[in-house]
Amino acid sequence: MSTVSQDGGTSRLRGILDPATHDAIMAAAERIKSLRCKRIARDEVNQPTINNWLEAMGIDNPRFKAGEAPPTMAQVWTMYGLGGKAGPDDPLHAMMNVLTEAGFTGVLGTNSEQKYDRYLRVGEHVRVETALDSIVGPKATGMGVGYFVTSRSTWYVGDEKVASMLFRVLKFIPKGAA
């Protein structure tokens, strides 16, 4: 059996995925692309969290002990926390659920592309907006057949954009599981 690739052509992925399943996944992706998850950080940018992050990363930069946060901490302020869960409007988690239900149970973070517009300062309150950027597949990989799912997150202080990130994961059927 052939599978349908993203461009509508056929590829030889040994019958792992039938065209109807692919079409359902891509239709769900189009619906999910309309979702926008907007979340406000539970805490302001603060020195104790910066200090803990610096210690964990082994960074000793006086700049970050004087009221500025490392740019790479942008995501830290809006994470769900240890007991937190993504809501139904979270596009990345919604797409991951669709793929899990279709049998793509493996997950592997592949890469992220980050851009920092400015340093955050202690006392600022950050918010993030997240959307599904793209889904590509099915692709045969060393891990198994899967889809690459990319989300786009943009962080703001007030109306000012301060950082953005493309985050890509591979959601796959582990080899030998099919």
List where the protein language model places each region:
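HotDog/MaoC-like acyl-thioester-processing domains
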Residues: 2-30, 111-178
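Hot-dog-fold acyl-thioester-processing enzymes
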Residues: 2-111, 178
